[in-house]
Every structure is written in C-alpha cells, then in structure tokens.
Swiss-Prot record:
A motif (DDXXD motif) lies at residues 333-337. This is Acyclic sesquiterpene synthase. Involved in the formation of (E)-beta-farnesene and (3E)-4,8-dimethyl-1,3,7-nonatriene, key signal molecules in induced plant defense mediated by the attraction of enemies of herbivores. In the presence of geranyl diphosphate, catalyzes the formation of the acyclic monoterpens (3R)-linalool and geraniol. However, the in vitro rate of sesquiterpene formation is about four times higher than the rate of monoterpene formation. Mediates the conversion of ent-copalyl diphosphate into ent-kaurene, thus having probably a role in gibberellin biosynthesis. Optimum temperature is between 30 and 37 degrees Celsius. Belongs to the terpene synthase family. The gene is TPS1. Monomer. It comes from Zea mays (Maize).
Length: 590
C-alpha cells in the first residue's frame, strides 16, 4: 500500500500546465510569483470559497492581458478544472483553479460570447462556478437555450450528446424553487439521454455510452465524493479520450500526470482510512459496545460516510469523531426504540444531565452503564481536543448536543407509551432532532479549520443549517423506512400524512413528501453557497456533506439498515485496490 501522497515530478509538471491555463494560455515557469499564485498558508481550496460578487473577484492580469489572444479557450480551461475535481486532486491546484474560475466569472459577468453563444460552455461554466461559490444566475442558461431556438425542446441537441450531458449536469445544481428552467432542462435532457442509451444511435463510442449511463445513475448529491473520484480514476480512459480530442489537453504527458497523481492520492488515502478504521474497531471493543446485542453495528457505514466526504488527510480528527458519534447515536436510537425500559431511558437522560456529578446516580442496568460511559468518555476526550483547537472550552456545548438528542428521543417514547398522535408540525420539530445528526455533524465543525465562536453557535444561521440538513435527512429516511416502522407500530411523516390526510394513500403521501425534501436540499445548498454568512464556508460544507450522505443511503432504498446494501461501497473507498479500465490496466505501473 502506498504511503501518504506527496507532490511528485509528475504533479509538478501538471502544476505547470494548470498555471499555463490559469494565466490565459501563456506558459509560465513553475513557481513564478504572479499575483494569481499568491495565497496565505491557510488559504483553502476553491471548493471552500464563498460566493463572490463581481467586485470581489481577484483582478488577476491586466485587462490588456485578458484581452490577448489566448491559446486555451474558456471551455478548455473549465474542462481541465472539471477533470481535476472529478479525479479528486483539485485541492493540490487551488490557486491555479481560482485564477481560471475568476477569469471565467469575469467573462460570465461581461456576457462574453465564448460563453453565451455556446450552450455546452455556458452549462459547464454555470455548474462549476456555482458549486465553487460564484454568484451566477440560471437566467443566463435560460437565455442561451432560448436563443438557440430550443426553448420548448432540446431535440436540436439530439446528436450532440456532450451538450446534453452538460445541460443535464447543470440542471442538478438548483438552489431555488424559482429556477424552473433547471427543472425543465433536466427533465428534457434526461429523457433524450435515456433515449440515446436505449437506441445507441448517437452513442457510437462505448466510452461516451458509459459516461452517460453513469451520469444518469443519479444527481451529484446522491453519491459520496470518494466514490465519484474512484469511478473517474478507474474509467480514466473515458476522460483521456475526451482530453485527446481537446486542444491543449491532448498532451499525453498531461493525462499521464493527472492519472498518476490521482492514483497516488487515492491509494495513500486508503492506507490512512484503513488505519483509522482499525483504531475505531478497537475503540468499539474497549467501550464494550459490541456486547450490546440489541444494537445495530454500523461502524463501517459511518466511517464510509466520513471518509467518502471528508477525504483529505488533514481531516482525520473530524472523520474519527464523525464515525464514533455515529456509532453511539445508532446504539442510543436502538436503545430507545427497542431495548430500553422506561426506567433505563430516564436513568440515561438523568446521567447525562448530571454529567460530572453522575456518580451521585446509580446505573439502572449494565446496558445503561456501557452506553453512558461510552458517551461520557468520548465527549470528554473530544471536548479536550476541541478546546485546544478552538482556544476555548467546548465540552459544555458537546454535552448540550447529546442532551438535546436524548430529550427528543424521550419525547418520542412518551408519545408512543401514551398513544399520542402528534400533528405533522409537532412530529417534524421533534423528529429532526431524533434523526440523530447533531452529535455527528456539530462537533466536527470544530475540526475543519476555522474558529467557531459561541456567537456563531448561537446564530440563527447555524440553527437553520442544522434544521434544513436534519429535516431533509429525516424525510428521506421516513419515505424509505415507512413499511418497517409501520409494522413496529411507529409513526413517521408518511403515516401521519395518511392519518391526517383523509383518503390519502401511502404512495400519494410519499410523493407529496418529495417537494419538502427537494425544498430543504435546495435551500441548504443555497445557504451553503451564500456569501453573506456568519458560519464559515468549510463548516457550512459539513451540513451539505451530511445531506449527501442521507441521499446516498436513503434516496432509493433503506440502504443504512441493510447489512449488505452498501458493503461494496465500503470496500471501494477503504479497502479495494483501484482497477483501471481500458489501456491503463496496472496501477503499479503508473
């Protein structure tokens, strides 16, 4: 197994290529001190940038330089950025990518004909700029489609598969219900692409067929980043073929460098992930959590969700606590649902309320002792580490997060015992907490870089991010787990809609819930990308990452409850060596 990745001669060569593109096509000596290269040691990747109004985009080169004939077109520059992001190595080229995107954004604001007269370039620019925090409107995409005479139909693109593919990808980054143009483009492009898959007419190239098939598997928010990276690395022959058809990306050394760095980065990450997972497995045994026979053992799934989204090596602490608290919340959930008596549950809540004074209260059972001791030790260790990182005491906040979860679960138990049927509003207020994302996501915010003051934690934006993420996740879960929970005598949003909706059927209730699910997802992404923000962008991104995790497990089935549904994805991210397709057959040779 490879050791942690370092910049190699190949990746340095690739940096030179990126720098050439970011400078407008003029070759630059690697390491030259141009304005677009300057950044502080703490400056983050463009994936963590905030939404930028026009005035805040870096000036880069002079206007005269920007207007010079450029060897690389905007489309070619964006294609390079897209390749680096899809291969999971964009963070190594943050400054170069920022230059490219700043230049592209200026061209977007100026309605440059290279963007506005080319549908494929416009769609790609819209998608990449938006997801990197630039303030772009879908109205521009509407005008481009309308100007092409295809306002009511995308049929004119029937034989232009790549344009259809870019339109389809652009349609998935909606941040508002008002962006109906994206829904329309998405529906039509998806239909035409599926027709092409079925007929094979316009997809004569097997690589293009596979690329379309992969894109239609689901929107970008339904998979984990590291799984997406793996697919692109293993199917690099598809990307390489497209690069070879593109001037200034067709250099075989460039494609080889991209592949080499991507493989080293992914493989070294697996080495790290395996070590972290082994540590977590030991922790489960040390805490005696494996002795709780009633509890679902979901460590692998929680670690997959952490490594699959927070994949950078420096986020080890965040991954570890994410997985630990995921395991603990699942055990607590099972304890409240099926295993604990009312006396045991009340005892556990009281112990957490007492916290450091818990010795004044006896453990009602060994099960309570194991669960409380695991929470207590983990929270105190985490609090000590977080307090050092944040330069202030954090433990009290971590205890409050757990107490909020336990009290909301106790409310659910009391409803069940008294046979009380809550209103839909009552249910959602409580159920967004009982879904259990608080102890997983909120502590991780302290370990992704920025300082999180107490005023940030108390700000309404912080609460809104949590509410949108938790509501989206809870509704996705309810739709997929309705049958099982109904058989167990439990209420959820589906059954409440049926109960309060008169003659509404179960299938109608599930369809009706799709709108609030979509709304929460769009509103969350909008808030994450918003520039005017109290919560730092790297922290906001964790809420979005967990939203993607919820889609990953619950968008089509109850993938979390199954022991095997996502087992192959666990291996794909953590254990399984890369298997390259096409001409790149031996990873070790790259």
């Amino acid at each position: 197994m490879a050791m942690p990745v370092k910049l190699t001669p190949a990746s340095l060569s690739l940096k030179a290529v990126c720098c050439r593109f970011s400078s407008g096509g003029h070759a630059l000596r690697f390491g030259s001190s141009l304005p677009c290269w300057r950044r502080t040691p703490t400056q983050r990747s463009t994936s963590s940038s905030t939404t930028r109004p026009a005035a805040e985009v870096s000036s880069g080169k002079s206007k005269q330089h920007d207007q010079e004939a450029s060897e690389a077109t905007i489309r070619q520059q964006l294609q390079l950025v897209d390749v680096l992001e899809n291969m999971g190595i964009s963070r190594h080229f943050a400054a170069e990518i920022k230059c490219i995107l700043d230049r592209t954004y200026r061209s977007w604001l100026q309605r440059h004909e290279e963007i506005m007269l080319d549908t494929m370039t416009c769609a790609m620019a819209f998608r990449i700029l938006r997801l990197n925090g630039y303030n772009v409107s879908s109205d521009e995409l509407y005008h481009v489609v309308e100007a092409s005479g295809l306002h009511n139909s995308l049929g004119g693109y029937l034989n232009d598969t790549r344009t259809l593919l870019e339109l389809h990808k652009a349609s998935t980054v909606s941040i508002s219900e008002d962006e109906s143009i994206l829904d329309s483009i998405g529906s039509r492009s998806r239909t035409l692409l599926r027709e092409q898959l079925e007929s094979g007419g316009a997809l004569r190239k097997p690589s293009l067929f596979k690329e379309v098939e992969h894109a239609l598997d689901g929107p970008f928010y339904t998979t984990l980043d590291r799984l997406h990276h793996r697919w692109n690395i293993e199917n690099f022959n598809i990307i390489e073929q497209h690069m070879l058809e593109t001037p200034y990306l067709s250099n075989q050394h460039t494609s080889r460098d991209i592949l080499a760095l991507s493989i080293r980065d992914f493989s070294s990450s697996q080495f790290t992930y395996q070590q972290e997972l082994q540590h977590l497995e030991s922790w489960v045994k040390e805490c005696r959590l494996d002795q709780l026979q009633f509890a679902r053992q979901k460590l692998a799934y929680f670690y997959l969700s952490a490594a699959g989204t927070m994949f950078s090596p420096e986020l080890s602490d965040a991954r570890t606590l994410w997985a630990k608290n995921g395991v603990l919340t699942t055990i607590v959930d099972d304890f409240f649902d099926v295993a604990g008596s009312k006396e045991e549950l009340e005892n556990l809540v009281m112990l957490v309320e007492m916290w450091d004074e818990h010795h004044k209260v006896e453990f009602y059972s060994e099960q309570v002792e194991i669960i409380f001791s695991s929470i207590y030790d983990s929270v105190n260790q985490l609090g000590e580490k977080a307090s050092l990182v944040q330069d202030r005491s954090i433990t009290k906040h971590l205890v409050e997060i757990w107490l909020d979860l336990l009290k909301s679960m106790m409310t659910e138990v009391e409803w069940r015992l008294s046979k009380y049927v809550p209103t839909e509003k009552e249910y959602m207020i409580n159920a967004s907490l009982t879904f259990g994302l608080g102890p997983i996501v909120l502590p991780a915010l302290y370990f992704v870089g920025p300082k999180i003051s107490e005023s940030i934690v108390k700000d309404p934006e912080y609460d809104e991010l949590f509410k949108l993420m938790s509501t989206c996740g809870r509704l996705l879960n309810d739709v997929q787990t309705f049958e099982r929970e109904y058989n167990e005598g439990k209420l959820n949003s589906v059954s409440l809609l049926v109960l309060h909706g008169g003659s509404m059927s179960i299938s109608d209730a599930k369809r009706k819930l799709q709108k609030p699910i979509d709304t929460c997802r769009r509103d969350l992404l909008s808030l994450v990308l918003r520039e005017e923000s109290v919560v730092p962008r790297p922290c906001k991104e964790l809420f979005w990452k967990m939203c993607k995790v919820c889609y990953f497990f619950y968008s089509t089935t109850d993938g979390f409850s199954s022991q095997v549904e996502r087992a192959k994805e666990v291996d794909a991210v953590i254990n399984e060596p890369l298997k390259l397709q096409g001409s790149h057959t031996l990873v070790s040779d790259v």
